């Protein structure tokens, strides 16, 4: 076998390996785009508010490619819920790093009209609660873990000496945060919506700040 033939074979093999690696990278990137699009749209329209075809279109992909990434729509729903929860967690944790009155800063950010109105990137603990309640165990477990992380964070931020007492207050605070935003979004009276947010914020800061 001539040297040039050997070189050609090696080049072809390397080219095939490159294409294979490139294909895997493309598939992973496309998978991520689908999950990201779903995480945003599910928060905006609800899990049942948008179909696979529209989600794939949002991701810039064809409907026919969906099942190369997911065995079922439920698999996508679960991954998207997990993604949305992680994104919300990072945002809340970032606010809580403010050195001066971190609890008050978190309350103000969570109960702001900006958070109320920005459903697409908002905290999924509030936005997807009803959807998760009707979802599978994996999604509910992810939601439960996120609630646990928020409670741990609030327990650290709330003043007091006794761990049990601070955890009880943390549960009350988180329930108020989630409930106030949900109600503020649901009413069609902007003045009342703002009153709900402000009253909840004032009460939380007075009790726990």
Predicted regions and their residues:
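Short, intrinsically disordered or compositionally biased N-terminal tails of bacterial proteins
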Residues: 1-22
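Short alpha-helical scaffolding segments that buttress acidic/His motifs in well-ordered protein cores
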Residues: 110, 125-129, 173-177
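Amphipathic alpha-helical segments used for helix-helix packing
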Residues: 103-106, 117-144
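Hydrophobic/aromatic-rich alpha-helical bundle segments in the mid-to-C-terminal region
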Residues: 137-145, 158-209
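Short, basic, alpha-helical segments at the C-terminal edge of helix-turn-helix-like DNA-binding modules
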Residues: 82-87
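Helix-turn-helix
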Residues: 33, 37, 41-75, 79
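Hydrophobic alpha-helical connector segments
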Residues: 79, 93-122
């Amino acid at each position: 076998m001539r040297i040039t033939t050997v070189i050609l074979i090696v080049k072809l093999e390397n080219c095939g390996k490159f294409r294979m690696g490139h294909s895997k990278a493309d598939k992973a990137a496309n998978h991520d785009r689908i999950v990201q699009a779903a995480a945003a749209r599910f928060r905006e329209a609800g899990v049942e508010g948008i179909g696979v075809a529209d989600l794939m279109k949002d991701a810039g992909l064809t409907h026919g490619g969906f099942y190369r990434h997911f065995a079922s729509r439920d698999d996508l729903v679960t991954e998207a819920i997990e993604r949305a929860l992680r994104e919300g967690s990072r945002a809340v944790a970032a606010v809580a790093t403010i050195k001066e009155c971190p609890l008050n800063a978190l309350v103000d950010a969570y109960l702001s009209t900006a958070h109320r109105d920005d459903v697409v990137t908002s905290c999924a603990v509030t936005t997807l609660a009803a959807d998760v309640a009707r979802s599978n165990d994996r999604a509910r477990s992810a939601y439960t873990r996120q609630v646990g992380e928020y409670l741990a964070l609030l327990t650290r931020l709330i003043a007091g000496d006794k761990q049990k007492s601070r955890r009880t207050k943390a549960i009350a605070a988180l329930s108020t945060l989630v409930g106030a935003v949900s109600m503020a979004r649901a009413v069609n009276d902007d003045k009342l919506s703002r009153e709900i947010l402000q009253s909840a914020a004032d009460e939380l800061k007075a009790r726990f700040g």
